[in-house]
Structures are given as C-alpha cells and as structure tokens.
Swiss-Prot record:
SMART domains assigned to the protein according to its UniProt record, in alphabetical order: EFh
Quaternary state and interactors: Interacts with ITGA2B (via C-terminus cytoplasmic tail region); the interaction is stabilized/increased in a calcium- and magnesium-dependent manner.
Tissue specificity of this protein: Isoform 1 and isoform 2 are expressed in testis.
Protein name: Calcium and integrin-binding family member 4
Length: 185
C-alpha cells in the first residue's frame, strides 16, 4: 500500500462534499485520511483510485455478505475514486434518507441487474443472509415464495422497484440494518 501526496483538503472542497453527502465534516476528513493511506504513492487524492479488492478488504466490508455487490454498485470500472468512496459512505450513513437507502439496496440486491428482484435474486439474498450453501431446495423455495407473497403486489413473481420500496418502507429494521460505519469514523 502506498500513500497519496499529503495535500490538505481545500476548505471549498470540504464544504462541497458536506453539501453533497449525508456526512459530517469530521467523517469526510476521516475518510480522506484513510483514503490517503490506501491510495497509490505520489498521487493527488482527487486523481487516485482504489481497487475493488482494497475497498472490499476494509474491515466494515470484509464481513458483509454483499461486499461484492456493494463494490459493483458504487465503483466505476471496478475502481473507486475518492468521490465514489464518499458516495458509498454517505448512502450507508445513519443520516441518509430512506429513499436513497432503498434505491441503493434495490441495486445491490438485483444480482442479475435486470431491473427487478426476481426469484433468483431472492434466493441469492436469502442464502447470503443466512450464510448457508446447504439449505434444502424446498426450504429455499418456501422462503422465496413467502417473500413474494408478502411483497409482490402484481403477482408476476418478481419485485419491481416500487414493490420493493413499499416493502422496505414497512420494514422497521431496514434503516437500522442498512448502515455501515466505514473507516472507523
């Protein structure tokens, strides 16, 4: 691991990042400091990028069963700019609004990226959440059917964004569970 050039963040940049995210000034500065430690040597932080492997190995993501999907959704061409990292941290912050969290949760859970959370996606979500590869096919089918019975309002065996949004809005635990504290900030 290298180190970026240790430029102080300009006050104007800090204010802009604070206006564009749900992060506090201190959180942005903490993320900036951590980013500097991980990025390639000799690069200015605005020009530097981190690899998906670097980001997915962060303690906050290393144990997350959806780390590969999170990285796919927030990275660009499998690399993270400083602003990509800020965007990811902002969405997973406590202050992020429910609609933003729901939008990104949908994108993360849409494994096949077809614009719906279908049976295949639901099965992958269930297996990851339960950390189980040896679940019986019958139980997996029952759990998937139960989720669809509760949330699939038009009975097409998949969840549109609006159906997913409706289900998450009724879930009291969603806002608390869709949080990640990055960088130890």
């Amino acid at each position: 691991m290298g180190q970026c050039l240790r430029y102080q963040m300009h006050w104007e940049d800090l204010e802009e990042y604070q206006a564009l995210t749900f992060l506090t000034r201190n959180e942005i500065l903490c993320i900036h400091d951590s980013f500097l430690k991980l990025c390639p040597p000799g690069k200015y932080y605005k020009e530097a990028t981190l690899t998906v492997d670097q980001v997915s190995s962060l303690p906050a993501l290393r144990v997350n069963p959806f780390r590969d999907r999170i990285c796919r959704v927030f990275s660009h061409n499998n690399v993270f700019s400083f602003e990509d990292v800020l965007g990811m941290a902002s969405v997973f912050s406590e202050q992020a609004c429910p609609s933003l969290k729901i939008e990104y949760a949908f994108r993360i859970y849409d494994f096949n990226e077809n614009g719906f959370i279908d049976e295949e996606d639901l099965q992958r979500i269930i297996l990851r959440l339960l950390n189980s590869d040896d679940m019986s096919e019958d139980l997996l089918t029952d759990l998937t059917s139960h989720v669809l019975n509760e949330s699939d309002l038009d009975n097409d065996n998949m969840l549109s964004f609006s159906e997913f949004e409706h289900a998450m809005a009724k879930s009291p635990d969603f806002m608390n569970s869709f949080r990640i504290h990055f960088w130890g900030c």
